[in-house]
Amino acid sequence: MTEPIISFKDFSFQYHSQATPTLQNINVDIYPGEKVLVVGASGSGKSTFANCINGLIPFKTKGNITGELYINNQDATVSCLHDRSNVVGTVLQDTDGQFIGLTAAEDMAFLLENNCVEQDDMKKNVSYWAEKVGMIEHLNHRPQDLSGGQKQRVSLGGILIHRTPILILDEPLANLDPATGHETLRLLNNIHEETKSTMIIVEHRLEESLDDTFDRVLLFKDGKIIANTTPSDLLKSSKLKEAGIREPLYCTALKYAEVDVESIDNLANLRDVCMSEHVKFKVKKWIDETSANNDNKYKSEPLLELNEVCVQYSDYSNSVLNNVQLNVYRREMLSIVGHNGAGKSTLAKAICGFLDITGNIQFCNRGFNQLSISERSEFVGYVMQNPNHMISEKMIYDEVALGLRARGMKESDIKIRVENVLKICGLYAFRNWPIAALSYGQKKRVTIASVLVLNPEIIILDEPTAGQDFYHYNEIMSFLIELNRQGKTIIMITHDMHLLSEYSSRTVVLSKGQVVADTTPVLVLNDKKICEIASLRQTSLFEMAEYIGISEPQKLVQLFINHDRKVRRQ
C-alpha cells in the first residue's frame, strides 16, 4: 500500500497567544498525487493546518504541539524551514507579501539564483514555467504593473520551478475576478495532471472551486476535521451547513425544486446532474408554478452624479477612467463589477477625492470637486480591497476607534459605537487582540468596522466579502441591508456573483475605464457578451438552466433569488 506523503496523528496546535488549541486532535493522511480541497469558516483552523504542513508553524510562528506530523516520512517537528521548503511549496493569499523580485522574471528566478544555477539554464526554466502559467509576455513587468491574478501566477511559477512534491495554495480565488478565477482553477488542474504533485487548495468559495476533479475534501470546524470525503458525498450531507459554508447555488435550487439530491450519483458534476430527466422535470415544474417577478426597484432621486469623469495617472498613460457618466441613487444598493484593471477601484478613489479628475462630481446637487478628502469623508466612507493598506493601529479596538477619536468624540460614546459595530462584524471577542494575530479575512472585517462606525451617507466597499466565510458574509451583508433600510446608500465593488445577484438592485459594469452596462443584476449575468467583456462568470444557476434546456435562464435565476430571500427572512 502507498505510504502517505502527509500524515497527522492525534495532532494539536495552540498559539501562545490563545487559550485553546486552534487545531484539535487532527488525524488524516494525504497520499502522493492527491488533489485535496480544504474548506472551513474563518478561524476554523484551515490556514493553520496548511502552515503546519509548509513549516511556517512551528519554525516561524511558535506554539504548543502535541501528537505527530510526518511530511514525506520525516518527523516535521525536527526538520527546519529550509528543508521543508524543498518538499512543500506555498502560494500565499496575499501575493504582495510573496513578491520579492523587481520584475516577474526576477521573482520567478529567485530560487535558481540562490542555488547558483547557470544563467542559460535559469532562463530556460523561467521561460518554460512562465509559458505554463501564462506569464511569458509579462516577464519584464514590475510587480506594480501586474494585476492580482498575474502576481499570483508569478508566485505559482516560482514555486513550480522548484518542483516540490507538495503544493499548497491559500485562498487562490480571493482577489480574482470570476473569469480569472475560473482560468486559475483550470490552470491548477492542468498543472496537477502534468506534475502529479500533491496539491492542497485552501478555499471557502465552493461555488467556484468545488468540482469532481478533487479526490477529497477536508472540512474544518472549530479546529477539527468534521468531514473527510468526496465532493459529491459532502454535497449530499448536512456538514456544510453545520460548518457555516454555503453550498453551490445549484444544490440549493435543486432542493427548492424538491429534487432528492441524495439519490444523485455525481452531485459535484452539474452537467451530469442535469442529464437526468427527473431533474429536468422537477426544475421546470418549479419554474412554471412559481412567479419570478423582480421586486427590486432603485430610487429615482440622484444622490451622487458623475459627469464625464476621467482619471489619468500620468501625462503619458491612457485614461484609467474615460468619460464616466453615472448616477447613484439615494438608498440603493449598487454593485460595480468588471475585470481586474477595469477601473472599479479607481472610480471609488475618484469619488472619495484620492485622485485628480477631469469632469464633475455632484453630491445632492452640490459641487463635490472642491471638497477636501476630509470634507468628503463626512459623506462618503471607503473600505479598500486590501486591508493591509488601511490598517494603522496595532490593536483591533484602537483601529476601529481611530476615526471617531480624530473627530474628537467622547471616549464613553466611542466605546458604545465601537463595541456595537465589533459585535455586528463578528469581532467583539477579539476586541483586545493585536491585529497581527488576525487572518486576512478577519483583518478585512476590521477595516469594514472602522468605516461603518463613522456612519457616512454613502458607504463604498471594495470587495466586502473577499476572504469571508458564509457566516460572516451573511453577518456583514445583513448589516449593510439594515443600513440601507435606514437610508444609507451602499456601493459594492465586487467579483462575487452571489452578492451581485442577491443583494444589489442595480449593477454597473466597467470595462477599460468605461461603463458598458447599467441595468439589473440578472440581465447583466444573462448577457454573455457583457460577461465576456467584463470577465464575469455566470453562476451555476445559469449553467443549470442551459443544461436543462430552459430558454430564458434569467427566469430561473430571478425565481431563485426571490425564493431564497423569503427563506432567509423566515
Swiss-Prot record:
Membrane-protein topology: Peripheral membrane protein
Keyword Transport: yes
Entry GO terms, CC: ATP-binding cassette (ABC) transporter complex
Pfam family, one: DUF3744
Binding site for ATP 1: G40, A41, S42, G43, S44, G45, K46, S47
Domain of life: Bacteria
Physiological role: Probably part of an ABC transporter complex. Responsible for energy coupling to the transport system.
Primary localization class, coarse: membrane
Family: Belongs to the ABC transporter superfamily.
Originating species: Staphylococcus aureus (strain COL)
Protein known as: Putative ABC transporter ATP-binding protein SACOL2708
UniProt GO MF annotations: ATP binding; ATP hydrolysis activity; ATPase-coupled transmembrane transporter activity
Domain ABC transporter intervals: 6-247, 304-537
